[in-house]
Amino acid sequence: KEKEIFDGVNYVINIEARGTSGPAIMFETSPNNKAVLDLYEATDKPYSYSITPEIYRLLPNGTDFTVFLENNLTGINISVLDGFENYHTPNDNPDNLSDKSMQHYGDQVLPIVREFVSNEKYSNPDVFESKEDSIFFTLGNQFIRYSKNTNMVLLALIALSILFAIKKLNITNIKKILKYIGRNSLYTLVTVGLGYGLSRLLALINGRKFEITYLPLIKFEDVIFIIVIQE
């Protein structure tokens, strides 16, 4: 209702928590985020994947960041997700918030703020205007980012590699190709099944409710998550 409070605002860093521990994930951006991510690259310890903003744009529910998006502001949204069982409960309080999570918030936000206030280019009100989204992910402490055109080239190279492998393996007819695809699909299903079974077993051992995308306080949850996303 009081939109004038946004006058002069050029970039928003929204910090929220949907849990009490774990890495601080940059999980949402404004649309056409190429220029927005130029500034995010200033962070010391990035943690983000381009699939998460795409997912949140499809969900009917909003976040604390939604009000800024509705007012056409650019920026990012950062949150922790582990310890979700504490969310909106009496345990959702500062005493239960992980010190490591707080540090990770700071490791991302402080360098961004310093870059924003010290780099003259960010005084330009149009600096964050862009017409495209980026593909991005973190690998270790490195923030990997490239354009959607580059992504299409990479997908084309993968397709060519598959065709080369088919030729190299002398798979020359449809029957053999289908057999090859079927065999590898079976391997994939077996791997997924084993990962799923192991996940349920560990949840049972730890006395926790099993969630396919969320295993709070489960031992080896990182290994399980890697198995799931690889498949």
Protein language model regions, located:
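Alpha-helical transmembrane segments of integral membrane proteins
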Residues: I158-E231
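C-terminal domain-closing interface element
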Residues: G8-I25, M152-T172
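Cytosolic-side membrane-insertion boundary helix
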Residues: D126-S161, I174-Y180, L217-F220
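Soluble extramembrane regions of membrane proteins in the secretory/endomembrane system
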Residues: K1-R145
